[in-house]
Swiss-Prot record:
GO biological processes: prosthetic group biosynthetic process
Protein name listed in UniProt: Probable 2-(5''-triphosphoribosyl)-3'-dephosphocoenzyme-A synthase
Catalysed reactions, semicolon-separated: 3'-dephospho-CoA + ATP = 2'-(5''-triphospho-alpha-D-ribosyl)-3'-dephospho-CoA + adenine
EC number: 2.4.2.52
InterPro entries: CitG, TriPribosyl-deP-CoA_syn
Record's keyword annotation contains ATP-binding: yes
Pfam families found in the cross-reference section: CitG
Role summary: Involved in the formation of 2-(5''-phosphoribosyl)-3'-dephosphocoenzyme-A, the prosthetic group of the acyl-carrier protein of the malonate decarboxylase.
Amino acid sequence: MSALIARQAPSAAERLADLAVQALVDEADLSPKPGLVDRRGSGAHSDLHLGLMHASAQSLWPAFAAMADAARSEGRVSQALRETLGQLGRDGEAEMLRVTAGVNTHRGAIWALGLLSAAAMLESGASAGGIAASAAALARLDDPAAPHNPDSHGARVCRRYGVLGAREQAQHGFPAVIEHGLPQLLASRRAGAGEQNARLDALLAIMSSLTDTCVLHRAGLEGLTRMQAGARAVLEAGGCASLAGRRRLRALEGEMLSLRASPGGAADLLAATLFLDRLTPAASAPIGSY
């Protein structure tokens, strides 16, 4: 008798959770990232390290699976689904904070990847843009139970500078991902940059266009302007696969460290980019089915 035991195939919700967690791990591992935690060190952070980022990502698997499964059960964008996703996201955040001893590692990623996981379940076979549009429809619905914290870093920055934050990025269909990160990832691959360089280029494309509230909080408008200009300079020099681009990347890293600023918003959206990029080829069956 065979010692092998047949294992039940993972559900669509479990596959989506796998993809979401893997996207977070891949983002954390990507190196060298200016100002961000990576395999070399903690970047501009004093309270984060790579092992903590990995543990945080793994802790979010149940929340992502539950959000995708809730979308499967509801079957459409609705107020009820929005409120369920909100509660599941808060539960996931509580578990993340338990695992990290109170350090906010992935709050923004829970928002972005939670919405996209649910939207991917609703939009079987859809393009990245179609999934992002469904996520936007969910994000535009109000969640009455969501805590209102006008003194959060993000809320204060948005008021002070009149910029859009993570909520509005989702409500507009993740333009930093759909219009910048994903096209750059695909273009750099086609140019033969290699996978790690293509992912770095995607991050830089997001950084060059995003009003990253994490950077605004730490370094103000001057810091944001320097980050965006530095990211554009890398891409204009040929990207991370070129010697000139790598020199520009080192210069940008020096600037981010001197500013003590980390583009955490861009990192979350790179994870969203990697999630959408891998969604179709990684699925062994149509998303939304068992």
